Amino acid sequence: MGSGTTALVCQMQGINSIGYDVMPIADVSLKAKAACMEYDLPELRAMLEELKSLHMPDSYSLKTPCIPITQDAYPEYNERYLQFIEDWRIHCIYSENAKNLLRLCILNSLEPCSYTVKSGQYLGWDSRSPKVIHANELRAAKGKKPLSAKTVRSNILDSRDTVLLELSHVIHDLEVIQHSSQTHEKAQITYKQNSVLFELPRLPDNILKGVITSPPYCNRYDY
């Protein structure tokens, strides 16, 4: 199912679709896109304006969770703001659709405000990151050469500005979609977070008229 774009286009064209994905992020993305005709645009604009007026207190000390591979992925301010806005998102008064959309915008903003870049299955790290700096210090202490210098982007973006800009762009896109798609027939999206290896055998025979899938990648075991 991926990010759900194919299912969304099918829905807007009146075509029922069935999809699967093993990644939890697909659930966030698909729910956000499947609700494109249901969003209350004044509510989303109000949420955006409230976020613009919201500033993280200097005393806020919580940081976004990490695993070993993402340790030190963000500048210190970004690391705190990402957790701050997630806390706000969870407890805000807006609808579940609006909350999920904001969550997707936060997720879409992670890479531009980090020291990392996705490279195949791996993360590429900027030489300015604390992780690389510390690794080079350890290498120098052992008489080894530093890691090759790498800049993933010229500027590591501010997480607050990035999230606000992402949400603003999404709201604009939703305005266009809702205006241009009012006459399109609604269709059903059936989605399960699981592997096609388990789910496809459970489908009744002769219910599919077509299959859309991404091309296989040599380095992906799940293909």
Model-derived features: positions:
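Conserved S-adenosyl-L-methionine
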Residues: 1-55, 169-205, 210-223
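Alpha-helical context
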Residues: 2, 6, 10, 58-65, ...
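Non-catalytic nucleic-acid substrate-recognition regions in nucleic-acid-modifying enzymes
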Residues: 12, 18-20, 24-112
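Intrinsic disorder/low-structure terminal segments
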Residues: 59, 73-76, 137, 146, ...
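SAM-dependent nucleic-acid methyltransferase catalytic core
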Residues: 82-85, 91-210, 218, 222
